[in-house]
């Protein structure tokens, strides 16, 4: 199987969230991440640019009535970097989660550019 994209987790932001999820939710997240790896044009239902941001995307996962969001961004075109994640409980994505994701993205690029 060839991959169009590589997906990595930056620090432990995503992993700390992921490790505490039920196995069935982890499996759906893995399925969705694999879809992002192998599909050139991922349907917006699973992977969508977050309006009003520069370069921030949300990976969308639904399991039953539960909705999960994983913030991500691109580096070097085909590298998807996972940031923070949360379980969505309201219609609108909480501003504090978006702000946190933007700070993580800034931290990633500042750290990368200082090397």
Stretches with model-predicted labels:
Residues 83:
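ATP-dependent carboxylate-activation loops
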Residues 1-67, 76-80, 89-115:
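Basic, Lys/Arg-enriched alpha-helical interface segments
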């Amino acid at each position: 199987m060839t991959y169009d994209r590589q997906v990595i987790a930056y620090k432990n932001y995503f992993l700390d969230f992921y490790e505490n999820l039920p196995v069935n939710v982890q499996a759906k997240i893995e399925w969705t991440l694999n879809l992002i790896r192998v599909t050139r044009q991922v349907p917006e239902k699973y992977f969508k640019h977050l309006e009003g941001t520069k370069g921030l995307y949300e990976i969308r996962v639904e399991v039953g009535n539960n909705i999960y969001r994983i913030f991500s961004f691109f580096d070097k075109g085909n590298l998807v970097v996972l940031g923070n994640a949360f379980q969505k409980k309201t219609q609108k994505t909480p501003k504090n989660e978006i702000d946190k994701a933007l700070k993580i993205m800034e931290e990633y690029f500042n750290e990368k550019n200082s090397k």
